């Protein structure tokens, strides 16, 4: 599904994306030897779990049979599902975990951009705004969580 045709398909891709990120952070938190990295990764699991629930809640409100179709756009890149320069494959340090969490993910941005530009329908624009706001809030929460006052 590299070229989603409906709003529901975008939500399915977002559900898969957040589920994969949650699983990655959970695995890394379990393997972490750096205590601060483990705490951060556990917090990231909570944030991704929240994102996953928000997306699933939006999906429950839509009937996939009565889909809102997207305007045509470029095919989404499947190869970019995580930051290319991320160091979270093994046992990341706190700084590597933080960089991973804050690194902009190209696929997520593509999905949200496609949703934002797909329709003039207020309900779709509202959905796109809610999902974009959620990602911005997550970024602020990560930044606040890691502040050293």
PLM-predicted stretches and their roles:
Residues 33-35, 121-122:
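Short loop-to-helix capping motifs
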Residues 11-25, 44-59, 101-108, 131-142:
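Alpha-helical transition-metal enzyme core signature, strongest for iron centers
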Residues 113-132:
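Acidic interhelical loop/turn segments
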Residues 147-149:
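Short, charged, intrinsically disordered terminal tails
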Residues 1-32, 94-118:
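Alpha-helical bundle segments that constitute or directly flank the non-heme di-iron/ferroxidase center
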Residues 60-94:
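Carboxylate-rich helix-loop segments that flank metal/cofactor sites and access channels
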